[in-house]
Amino acid sequence: MKYKLLSVALLVVANLSFAQNKSAIWNASTKKTTLIALDENIQLPSEKVFELNLSGLRSALNSAPKRMSSSQSQNIISIPNADGNLEQFKVFENSIMEAELAAKYPEIKSYVGIGIDNPLSIAYFSVSPLGFKSMVLSPNKSTEFIEPISADLTTYTVYKKADKKNAFTPFECSVIDKAAASPTMMLRNADDSVLRTFRLAVSCTGEYATYFGGTKAQALAAINASMTRVNGVFENDFAIRMVLIANNDLVLYTNASTDPYTTSYNSQLQSTLTSVIGEANYDVGHLFVRASNNGNAGCIGCVCVNGSKGSGFTSSTIPTGDTFDIDYVAHEIGHQFGANHTFSMSNEGTGANMEPGSGSTIMGYAGITSQDVQTNSDAYFHAFSIQQVTNNVKAKTCQTNTPTGNAVPTANAGLDYTIPKSTPFMLTGSGTDADGDVLTYNWEQFNSASSTQTGASSAASA
């Protein structure tokens, strides 16, 4: 097997100062059997349950500085982890809406927190009329999520993605994977010290809006919660963020009988965004649907391309939570930004089929095939997906580019070796960073499966 070493430089906001602890906002709870759940079909781990003072949290967050205009924060918030402990984070408001939309819906907020107790942890969370939802990324443990589990939005469960059982019917991504028109070149490093911001238009069906209460504000709150998490992964892996356009609420439909969507979601979304928003006014478009579990990006790498950039959709019977956000939405938008499927159970001829079985990263099919190696996708992209997306967006011009000032780290995976099958081995790598940032590493298989390594043999032989 061939391996490449992927070095990940976490985006770090420096010179943050300490403020008082606001841990009293969260209190451990034993209310596990008396809950009135948001949706009885949602099955979440409930070993660690907390009560949240939501109004107190809102008040505590009022002083959080805006991330894009400040490098310092005295706002410190505690967030419970899956071990039942409270972890402190230095918090910035991190709106994923353009200013006009954010001003129209001031109760819908997004934030990012930089770990104090664990400096390698980054929390992405949203606060809205739908409550509190979070995702904490850390290189030394499984991604952790917080979800409301009571209808009054006072009780929350904290869990690791690795501990969650998949209660969904299989998800089908029906996008047709195509090889890149020109060969993908190996780059020295995917990072070029540029943050790329794309204007995002998200539409929804009437059924989706009804699921969250039936108003545009509630639909937007749900979209904001999902995209806060998706943005967290895209920022961490691609240095890409998406911002909902100022008039995004024009394409939020609350009546299933009159919305412009039937079943031809790809073409109907593209037509809707072209006519209602205008091709010059967004960079990538997506549709959220409450229906059967499936999705289709409409194209590969078509962000910024008029006539096709607004043709992706994600559909689920339960269009909320980490499975919807990470396994489904991030997967389909990943296609739109240029990533192909990474599983090896089937060889699609793109050069990306590198992961054993159905895969374990976002562009795989974790948990939904007969060649599964795990139940759900890990909340990150495979090294080849990162290469595909970053190569693609570096050739785009529709986005806004912002220099990060972050020095590009270097990684050394050592010499290449060929060893017999089933031989034990140990991998040793190294890296350097001119800024002195702590680097994290991830070893991944980096050769695409041959025709004899697909199907039932993919998990065992890859």
Segments from the language model and where they lie:
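Exoplasmic/lumenal beta-rich domain surfaces
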Residues: 243, 442-462
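Short, solvent-exposed loop/linker segments at the N-terminal edge
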Residues: 417-425
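Bacterial Sec-dependent N-terminal signal peptides
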Residues: 1-24
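N-terminal prosegments of processed precursors
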Residues: 20-150, 265-268
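Extracellular acidic, Ser/Thr/Pro-rich low-complexity tracts
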Residues: 419, 430-435, 447
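Fold-level signature of zinc-dependent metallopeptidase catalytic domains
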Residues: 21-26, 30-36, 154-301
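The catalytic-center signature of Zn2+-dependent metalloproteases
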Residues: 245-267, 305-380, 453
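Proline/serine/threonine-rich low-complexity linkers at boundaries of modular beta-sandwich domains
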Residues: 393-410
